[in-house]
Amino acid sequence: RFYSSRDETVIQIEIEPGVNDVNDALVFSFKAMSQLANISKTHFTHSVLVMHFGNTTLPVVAKTDLECAKGFFIYVSENESQWRKNCLTIQDH
């Protein structure tokens, strides 16, 4: 899904990761969105990942600023820990 909100242009995907695969799924998903945004003609500012865990729990929503995330996913000048600390926001809804 692609949308604009306020001053943001967002790329969003929704996934249903296994309980044991949450971290790998999170990193893989944000890497894919970062790579797509990097080659896109549209200037995306943020990526959003919505993770669903069955019918009984509320989804977890993670968001990253794409410019900030480039250091980890595109340029490989930062590590995952730096990306999580500086660029990633996770909320349960």
What are the residue ranges of the model-derived segments?
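Short, non-transmembrane amphipathic alpha-helical segments
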Residues: 22-44
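Polar/charged, Gly/Pro-rich intrinsically disordered segments
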Residues: 1-17, 41-93
